[in-house]
Amino acid sequence: MQTTEPMTPPAPLASAQTVIDLGAIDHNVRVLRELAGSADVMAVVKADAYGHGALPVARTALAAGAAALGVATIPEALALREGGITAPVLAWLHPPGTDFAPAIAADVEVAVSSRRQLEQVTAAAAEVGRTATVTVKVDTGLSRNGVGAADYPEVLDVLRRAQADGAIRVRGLMSHLVHGDDPENPFNGLQGQRLADMRVYAREHGVDYEVAHLCNSPAAMTRPDLAFEMVRPGISLYGLSPIPERGDMGLRPAMTLKCPVALVRSVHAGDGVSYGHRWVADRDTTLGLLPIGYADGVYRALSGRIDVLIKGRRRRAVGRICMDQFVVDLGPDADDVAVGDDAILFGPGANGEPTAQDWAELLDTIHYEVVTSPRGRVTRTYLPAGQQD
């Protein structure tokens, strides 16, 4: 995805774009900071900040008071460093063959999930000639990534020796919730207790973690008892409710997906639209062509199921969504719509446009998937904090 800097002219009319409201990011970080109490906020900007652009989001989050940044992979962390980010950055997912040396050289904190990874990090630190900052990721019930209880004692042994040798600095202990979006689920408390117990066990065996963190977005907003010294929100940074049934939870969605109307044309009753003529006009009407399709992140499964906001009115998509384009029914009285007018596919919803949550419900998925889908030819433009479209 291409990115334009704040305040640059909009992309050519043939292009779709996501407009990212950095003021919303700023607002959301401040909401999360207040809810976190004395705990720090680690802003998760993995996957290119959930499709919002890692560098602009990272800068905004740090300016709003986030203490650190979290990403999945080392290349994501290094991209932040190359972009001038000097704040603490933690990377926690490492495929086989990962070279940890560049991360250590760039002062990127590395989370390890096994004895093997820890030994690789220690070896890389010796190679670089620099102390590595390490967090231990433990499995407290998700059964995904992380050191299990059975392997934890031997990992602590390696950790203690490496720390004594000056190869590593032991920074944190982290885990991830199974039922974060179900705040009252008793398993959340069990995971919190397991993490606390593993911290105590480590201290009794010569390893003292500086911080522990467990809370994702929903827990950061609803379970202050599980905050430890740091919370690790992701989706809430971008203004999407981590518990949709609770409403917006005081958050402001940051992403709007839009494109210009590329063509306006009239059709007669009985005329079919797009591949297979799955939609046939039941009256004389006017159609609008939108230059965005499934190659750009508009799911083909949404064919004939979504509305698009044009000139303050919702217009229904008709016919098949194609690779590069789809068609909307503007209605027989569409004299107000012209080529170049904005078509809002989804956004915050404040002006009646569909939202990412609307798409998620139609697709039987989550809004995380929706906002990470715009890609390829979709350009990205930013509204600085304090400016609205």
Swiss-Prot record:
Entries under InterPro entries matching the protein: Ala_racemase, Ala_racemase/Decarboxylase_C, Ala_racemase_C, Ala_racemase_N, Ala_racemase_pyridoxalP-BS, PLP-binding_barrel
Pathway, per record: Amino-acid biosynthesis; D-alanine biosynthesis; D-alanine from L-alanine: step 1/1
Molecular function GO terms recorded: alanine racemase activity; pyridoxal phosphate binding
Keyword set includes Isomerase: yes
Main enzyme class: isomerase
GO terms, biological process: D-alanine biosynthetic process; peptidoglycan biosynthetic process; response to antibiotic
Residues with N6-(pyridoxal phosphate)lysine modification: 46
CC terms in the record's Gene Ontology section: cytosol
E.C. number(s) listed in UniProt: 5.1.1.1
Keywords: Antibiotic resistance, Isomerase, Pyridoxal phosphate
Annotated catalysed reactions: L-alanine = D-alanine
Cofactor: pyridoxal 5'-phosphate
Active-site residues, as the UniProt record annotates them: 46 (proton acceptor), 275 (proton acceptor)
Residues where substrate binds: 144, 323
Protein's job: Catalyzes the interconversion of L-alanine and D-alanine. Overexpression due to a natural mutation in the promoter is responsible for mediating resistance to D-cycloserine (DCS) in mycobacteria.
Name of the molecule in the record: Alanine racemase
Organism: Mycolicibacterium smegmatis (Mycobacterium smegmatis)
